[in-house]
């Protein structure tokens, strides 16, 4: 199931075979192994009859996967090929989570009950995941994070809501706009 590709179930339901791709490297850095796996899968996406790429708990459209892999040409990380960014409505707003950070030895991230738009929350989660992977970051319970000098978003470690195990929760809410008189 994916909000990125509405025809995913119908399309991949027609598959007649599959290829399992994996990269094993004793002592290899997870980022390097991940890049190699993306290159391998992206080359498969160039084949005429490929229907989808299953990774990070979802199916990606081959053209999306390939476009997302091409960022490596500029030295960027193919985070969209590694991490799924799940979004769902909750009683108090929109919530989101990552799925795939554990493949790099990192805890998954969740944002609960945000008052942002879904695309803003997805972009926020993307930026956090990219930051974690690009800088080999480790969060700790009680820390804060921000993308500006004044932004301090609390980080807590607790049982996952949308993901298994423990996850880091980041409180991400926009301040209400107050109208001046």
Where would I find each of the regions flagged by the language model?
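Internal, hydrophobic cores of structured domains that mediate oligomerization or house catalytic pockets
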Residues: 1-83
